[in-house]
A protein has these predicted regions:
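Aromatic-flanked redox-active Cys/Sec active sites in thiol-based oxidoreductases
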Residues: 8-12
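FMN-binding flavodoxin-like domain, especially the glycine-rich phosphate-binding loop
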Residues: 2-4, 14-17, 21-38, 42-44, ...
Length: 140
């Protein structure tokens, strides 16, 4: 059984809702899952998991949230080489540039993206919920 961490930061609850759907998808596929906020996770926990789903909404000028999530993620970057990961997040404006930039960073760090990233415009709709569950299953 694989062990998955679903790590997220959420300001309005949209990315948190996505995180819970990712966890459900991974559990349904047989994985053991821990759902953690960015402040509960760090580089020291990376080795305890077979795969990690990272979730963060677009903030400011299409950037990762910079007070909790981005510092935690930066600390984890050294452990991304060969690690199976997936990315998800919500946004209220723009076209997903923050996600494309984030994916490129992860690839440069040597991470293995298990599936396409999932984006939701504001609250996740039925399609985004299904995509989040599929993302979780892809990590399991």
């Amino acid at each position: 059984m694989s062990k998955i961490a679903v790590v997220y930061w959420s300001g309005t609850g949209n990315t948190e809702a996505m995180a819970n759907e990712v966890a459900e998808g991974a559990k349904a596929a047989g994985a053991e899952v821990d759902v953690l906020t960015a402040s509960e996770f760090g580089e020291d926990k990376m080795d305890a998991y077979d795969a990690v789903a990272f979730g963060c909404p677009a903030m400011g000028a299409e950037e990762l949230e910079d007070s909790e999530f981005e510092p935690m993620f930066s600390d984890c970057e050294g452990k991304l080489g060969g690690k199976k990961i997936a990315l998800f997040g919500s946004y209220g404006w723009g076209d997903g540039e923050w996600m494309r930039t984030w994916e490129e960073t992860c690839k440069a760090d040597g991470a293995v993206l298990a599936c396409d990233s999932v984006l939701a415009n504001e609250a996740p709709d039925d399609d985004a919920v299904a995509a989040c569950k599929a993302l979780g299953a892809a990590l399991a």
